[in-house]
Amino acid sequence: VLLEIFTHDGVGTMVVEDKLDDLRPATLDDVGAILQLIEPLEADGTLVPRGRAVVEREVERFTVLEHDGIIYGCVSITPYLSENMVEMACLIVQSEWQGEGEGELLLRHAESRAKTLGATHLFVLTTRTSHWFIKRGFMQGSVSNLPKEKQAQYNRSRNSLVFIKKLK
């Protein structure tokens, strides 16, 4: 009973005025929670370090997953519309929530936003999760397939693989 009362994912019935789960655009108030999600992955080299100033400046690119006021997932998109492409980055779901389809939800949301912006392709750079993206319809590409601006920023020392998905 105590686990149900004192945790965010207890089992039981709760009557609430608003919904407990929410997928929504990030705000400046969310920056601290986003940093908590991304910092461990920056520390182990999975993600490129961004820092608070970058996340604050680019917060409108982020979407967050929230449960009962706790942010447990995020994704970022960066449009390169002159080349009809959108980059998806920082797709993160807190470990306790993994395996529940939340990553898929964030991916579908990023795809939908990219299509709304007029993009025909979504791309990611990854050093560790190739299998996840391949399973979801991404094809391996090369640096030369990236938008010119992104090619100029590409850090070859990270050896990130490029994966691209054609949006339908």
Model-derived features: positions:
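Conserved beta-strand in the GNAT
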Residues: 64, 70-79, 85-92
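Active-site beta-strand termini and strand-to-loop segments that position acidic
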Residues: 66-68, 165-167
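A generic "binding-loop/recognition-motif" signal
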Residues: 128-129
